A protein has these predicted regions:
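A short beta-strand element within the Helicase C-terminal
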Residues: 229-230, 424-425, 432-447, 456, ...
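Conserved SF2 helicase motif VI
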Residues: 265-266, 449-473
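Conserved segment of the helicase C-terminal RecA-like domain
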Residues: 461-495
């Protein structure tokens, strides 16, 4: 078979296929959409498959590496048109010019020097133009983005860069770091910049050299706004499966570089994995948390303690088990409803609540408590108890709290050498991208199943700080198990086990503990 690019470089046309090759490509490039099984239960005739190859044998150019891998796997012959390589890669890119530039940029910086993996990662980006990087949280992704921007701005015609982030904190934090790096490097910030998010000052025109914006705010901009950008950089590109980010990428029609970076890329072969590649490009560089800690020694080792709590009596466990027994029989929504009931039981348990608060109050170092439920006030309840019953400095943060207050909370913890600060925050505000080096403990008090979120939570602890040799993540699980059949394991317990396997697969030291609050007189 032969691969040729369309005139606009958006698609690969695959020709000269045998019937066997065509059928296999159709199978390999067809993925089930998220939650397909729920849709199928609701409507057995629903189409839950999405094909990334059309009837004309065309695939998005970003999936070129998947095409190569499929052909290798099934021993298919594959040739490319003569111009293919230099249209997906930057064949004119000069390696020496890049490495000399980076060396010169940081020559007077006595505090920060790029690691080899950071320089290599950006070298690969400049070589491939449309691609993704998977670099562990705390791996210095913002510094890598800075290196990319500075090189393009000073050495190419790319003068307008769009920097897309998932929340307002990251927009402001990223800009502040860019300016800080300039100051450390003793170079002028000779470029214009702006922020676009819910708390940023509005401007009549945005024609800056670099714009830091949240995808929630950027998606409201008109098509013409995006035509100015030569490069678009998606921070935490695991979110790129969201329609808002896909629309942003579609509108950046003149972007010569489309780059995505994340700490946890979706699993190989999944719909989420393919959709990100189709809009941005393949993962061309990886650097794991294990490598970050054990090879480059740029991150703090994290010890994970999984604490499974038993606090529900037999009668309530039987009621929960009966609910689980009916899942799949009545309505497809029942599984979600049972999970909601389990979460409500966990939130309403006074034994569980006291255990968590006592655990937090006894910590001797700065601690972040992460919760998921805002509507029912679980995090606020923990905050109020700690505020009233401890002598620690306690802060509360959720999506409704102002940026100024959040920054004050972060700075208070960063400056606290006594280790006497606790921040109680929602997972979606402080679970991702927040940079606090002087953080020693994280307590996860509400369940999450997301692989990428687990990676982000661990990353909060991996920042290096002179006061810590290691950090601790305490993961709270809930045991409502009863019986010996396949319905014995409750949903929150399953999530707890999934997270445990996730920690282990990432190479973190994991220890599990079982605490029976019905028998233990803790208070």
């Amino acid at each position: 078979m032969k691969a040729t690019l369309t005139f606009d470089d958006k698609f690969i046309v695959i020709s000269d296929l045998t019937d066997i090759e065509r059928k296999q490509l159709q199978l390999s490039f067809t993925k089930k959409i998220p939650n397909w099984f729920i849709i199928k239960k609701k409507n057995p005739f629903a189409n839950v498959d999405l094909s990334f190859i059309n009837s004309s044998n065309m695939i998005p150019t970003g999936l070129w590496m998947e095409l190569v891998n499929i052909c290798k796997k099934f021993n298919f012959s594959l040739t490319f048109s003569s111009d293919f390589n230099c249209r997906i890669k930057n064949c004119e890119f000069n390696e020496k010019i890049f490495y000399d530039y980076i060396s010169d940029l940081f020559k007077s910086n006595e505090k920060i020097k790029p690691e080899n993996y950071q320089t290599k990662g950006i070298y690969n980006v400049l070589s491939y133009k449309n691609c993704c990087l998977e670099v562990s949280t705390s791996g210095g992704k913002t510094l890598m983005a800075y290196m990319l921007f500075k090189f393009l701005y000073d050495n190419s015609e790319c003068k307008h860069v769009l920097y897309v982030v998932p929340n307002t904190n990251l927009a402001t934090q990223s800009l502040d770091k860019f300016l800080k790096y300039d100051d450390m490097n003793n170079v002028d910030s000779n470029y214009s910049y702006s922020e676009i998010h819910s708390e940023a000052k509005k401007k009549k025109e945005y024609n800056d050299n670099i714009i830091f914006g949240t995808y929630q705010s950027l998606c409201k901009k008109k098509k013409e706004f995006f035509e100015q950008f030569d490069c678009v950089f998606i921070d935490e590109c695991a979110h790129a499966k969201a329609d808002s980010i896909k629309n942003i990428l579609k509108k950046c029609v003149n972007a010569k570089y489309k780059v995505g970076v994340t700490g946890t890329f979706p699993k190989d072969g999944t719909y989420e994995n393919f959709i990100i590649q189709s809009y941005i490009g393949p993962v061309i560089f990886k650097y794991s948390s294990y490598e970050l800690i054990n090879e480059s020694h740029r991150a703090t080792p994290v010890n994970v303690k999984g604490i499974l709590l038993n606090y529900v009596d037999i009668e309530k466990k039987e009621a929960l088990r009966n609910l689980r027994m009916n899942v799949g029989k009545d309505t497809f929504e029942l599984g979600g409803k049972v999970l909601s009931v389990e979460k409500e039981v966990a939130r309403n348990s006074q034994l569980r609540f006291k255990y968590i608060c006592d655990l937090a109050s006894k910590t001797t170092k700065n601690t972040l408590i992460l919760f998921g439920d805002i509507q029912n006030g679980y995090g606020r309840k923990i905050y109020n108890h700690l505020k009233e019953n401890t002598d620690k400095s306690v802060f509360y943060v959720d999506g409704g709290i102002s940026n100024d207050y959040r920054d004050n909370a972060k700075q208070s913890m960063e400056n606290d050498e006594t280790g006497n600060t606790i921040i109680v925050a929602s997972i979606f505000t402080f679970g991702e991208g927040i940079d606090i080096s002087n953080l020693h403990n994280v307590i996860l008090v509400e369940s999450t199943k997301s692989d990428s979120m687990v990676g982000q939570i661990i990353g909060r602890l991996m920042r290096k700080h002179e006061s810590k040799e290691s950090a601790i993540l305490i993961d709270i699980g809930d045991d409502f198990r009863l019986g010996n059949d396949n319905k014995k394991n409750n949903y929150l317990y399953k999530h707890f086990i999934d997270r445990a396997n996730n920690y282990k697969s990432r190479g973190f030291n994991y220890e599990s503990y079982y605490v029976n609050l019905l028998e233990t007189n803790l208070f």
